[in-house]
Regions:
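Short hydrophobic/Thr-rich beta-strand motif most characteristic of the beta2 strand and flanking loop
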Residues: 26-33, 41
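Receiver (REC) domain active-site loop signature in two-component systems and cognate sites
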Residues: 56, 79
Length: 142
C-alpha cells in the first residue's frame, strides 16, 4: 500500500521520526510545522491522509481538523491525531471529525497500522447509511 501523508507537528524531530517510519513503508511524506502551514499546503499536495499534533503554535491540531472538515475539498480526508492527548482533547477531536488517535510516545508499528487502516477505510465503499465511523481506525482491528 502507498499513499501521500501530510505530517503536521511543530517538533522537527517528531516530524522526521514519523517521516522516516512512513517512508520505510513506501509512503510519500510531506511535512508542515503547524496547522496554519497545513491549511496552506493541503490543497497543493493533495494528501491521502493528514496526521496532526494537538499542541502547535498559530493553529492547533484540533482547530486544524475542524477547518479541514468544514472545507468541502478536504471534508472526507482521513485525519489522525498523533499527540499526548487528554480525554477532553480526544472528545473534542471526535466532535471535530478526527478519525483516529495515536498517543505519543508511539511504536512505529502502531503508526503504520493506524495509517494503513485509515487509507483502507478511505478506499472502502461507504457503509449502508453512507457515513464514516470516526474514531474506529485507532481502536479497531483489521
Amino acid at each position: 500500500m502507498s499513499g501521500r501523508v501530510l505530517v503536521v507537528d511543530d517538533n522537527k524531530v517528531i516530524r522526521q521520526l514519523i517521516r522516516v517510519n512512513l517512508e520505510l513503508e513506501g509512503f510519500e511524506v510531506v511535512t508542515a510545522a503547524d496547522g496554519a502551514e497545513c491549511l496552506e499546503v493541503v490543497h497543493r499536495v493533495s494528501p491521502d491522509l493528514v496526521t496532526l499534533d494537538v499542541m502547535m503554535p498559530r493553529l492547533d491540531g484540533l482547530r486544524t481538523a475542524a477547518r479541514l472538515r468544514s472545507d468541502p475539498r478536504t471534508s472526507g480526508l482521513p485525519v489522525a491525531i498523533i499527540s499526548a492527548c487528554t480525554q477532553y482533547e480526544v472528545e473534542t477531536g471526535l466532535a471535530a471529525g478526527v478519525d483516529a488517535f495515536l498517543a505519543k510516545p508511539f511504536e512505529p508499528a502502531e503508526l503504520i497500522r493506524v495509517v494503513r487502516q485509515l487509507l483502507l477505510h478511505r478506499e472502502a465503499p461507504p457503509s449502508a447509511d453512507g457515513s464514516r465511523e470516526p474514531g474506529r481506525a485507532g481502536s479497531s482491528r483489521g
